[in-house]
Regions:
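Conserved N-terminal structural module of periplasmic/extracytoplasmic solute-binding proteins
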Residues: 7-8, 20-111, 270, 292-295, ...
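Short, solvent-exposed loop/beta-turn-alpha elements that line the ligand-binding surface or hinge
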Residues: 122-133, 189-191, 195, 213-231, ...
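Hinge/lid segment of periplasmic solute-binding proteins
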Residues: 81, 106-158, 168-179, 185-189, ...
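Glycine-centered hinge/linker elements that transmit conformational signals in sensory
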Residues: 179-183, 219-248
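C-terminal motif of bacterial Sec signal peptides marking the signal peptidase cleavage site
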Residues: 16-18
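Extracytoplasmic/periplasmic substrate-binding proteins
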Residues: 47-48, 55, 61-62, 234-313, ...
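Long, aromatic- and glycine/proline-rich binding clefts that accommodate carbohydrate-like moieties
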Residues: 285-288, 334-385, 389
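Extracytoplasmic "Venus flytrap"/periplasmic binding protein-like
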Residues: 62-133, 140-142, 171, 257, ...
Length: 410
């Protein structure tokens, strides 16, 4: 009886031991699962206009594919309004909440790099990665030779004109003035010079560059009231009678006015194609290279991926930036708004040689990037107001630009 009892006791002990081991194994598995969860890193990316649909479809798709390839990295998007973007970046940085990645106009890189907000990504980029990019496009993301931004969008400009009214597009400023005058009839204006805060400066800069002007010199100092820039505004005054109100007209109004038979010519970029094609039957159009002043010129505009200097996940953030720079992903971004190639392989697409894109592609050979100023918002506001006052006769071109120079050079 005693032996039988000991045998039963032994079986019972072995059973408890097995249960204990199983429980221990379950605990280990649970710990593994928890460790996996702890290993997941969430990075945040600031995208202007995202809530209004800007690149929302493209980034939603790309983020989904990135997270599938990188299960330990999650990407969350933060939206901001275009006009508040730069101030939002400063506020978030000062509150120690700057997103890991921020989409910014390359024109603002000097401001944010000098303020310590941006991370220098020069050492993160391999030679192989750099070689994928068109060199002078990649250079728009540099400040003082350092790569504070990696371009993700590039736009150029063309002259859109009514092909049924204008037999040959104007090739220089004198011809532009004459054609604008000839086509200002009834409700139709011959040309447009928008001066809105959101986009007007880029369109004004086309003419500044065509006249051999600049905004800052080689040392980064303002030269806004230069002889060349005053001459540009004097030309604008000649055009003033043939353009819609420059103060209230925005760049986004131009294509709508064109298809409504209210405008004969305007300057803009590839994003206008959808609107223009819809009106082709009643308002046929063609695209030409921008008319030249003393020289050919166009404003080269890029937006860039940037990284916060206080990000705790710089490695993961750069992985996403690198992912977005792959050909298959960059092509989707470029196509979203009729932009132009960032990468060499993108430029091989034959569509950039068609009648719509070719004039905008060819003018980029004579392009100048937006000026890198100490504070873009301050410059943008002061400069556009100066142009408005000159065009509306409130001040002479010299007086308007003198005021702007004095205000910004303080």
């Amino acid at each position: 009886m005693k032996k039988k009892f000991l045998a039963i006791l032994l079986v019972f002990v072995l059973f408890l031991s097995a249960c204990g081991n199983k429980s221990s194994d379950n605990s280990k598995d649970s710990n593994k699962d928890e460790n996996k969860k702890e290993d997941v890193v969430t990075i945040h990316m600031l995208v202007p206009g995202y809530d209004q649909g800007y690149l929302k479809e493209q980034f939603t798709d790309a983020i989904g594919r990135f997270e599938k390839e990188n299960p330990n990295i999650k990407v969350e998007v933060i939206s901001a309004g275009w006009e508040e973007l730069n101030s939002k970046v400063v506020q978030l940085y000062q509150a120690k909440k700057a997103p890991d990645i921020m989409l910014l106009g390359s024109r603002s890189l000097r401001q944010f790099s000098e303020n310590g907000i941006l991370e220098d990504m020069t050492s993160m980029m391999t030679d192989e990665q750099k070689a994928d990019y068109i060199e002078n496009v990649l250079d728009t993301g540099k400040v003082g030779g350092k790569q504070f931004g990696i371009p993700m969008a590039l736009s150029s400009r063309g002259l859109f004109y009514r092909s049924d009214l204008i037999k040959e597009a104007p090739k220089n400023w004198e011809e532009l003035l004459n054609v604008a005058k000839e086509n200002t009839k009834g409700n139709m204006k011959g040309f447009a010079i928008p001066t809105d805060l959101t986009s007007g400066t880029d369109e004004i800069l086309n003419f500044i560059y065509q006249n051999g002007g600049k905004i800052v010199d080689e040392n980064g100092n303002f030269v806004i009231n230069s002889k060349e820039n005053v001459e540009t505004l004097e030309f604008f005054k000649k055009l003033a009678a043939y353009v819609p109100d420059p103060v209230s007209t925005t760049r986004n109004d131009q294509s709508k006015m064109f298809v409504n038979n209210d405008l004969a010519m305007y300057i803009s970029g590839g994003w206008e194609k959808e609107t223009m094609d819809k009106g082709m039957d009643k308002t046929p159009y063609k695209v030409a290279m921008l008319p030249e002043g003393k020289q050919k010129g166009v404003t080269i505009v890029t937006d860039s991926y940037t990284m916060s200097s206080i990000s705790e996940h710089k490695k993961e953030a750069f992985e996403f930036i690198k992912f977005m720079g792959k050909l298959e992903n960059q092509k989707i971004i470029t196509a979203a708004y009729g932009w132009f190639p960032i990468l060499h392989k993108e430029a091989e697409d034959p569509k950039y040689a068609d009648d719509f894109n070719k004039p905008m592609r060819d003018i980029m050979e004579f392009g100048t990037p937006e000026p890198q100023v100490p504070n873009w918002d301050d410059f943008n506001k002061s400069f556009t107001i100066a142009v408005q006052k000159a065009m509306t006769g409130q001040l002479s071109p010299q007086e308007a630009l003198d005021n702007c120079q004095n205000e910004l050079a303080k």
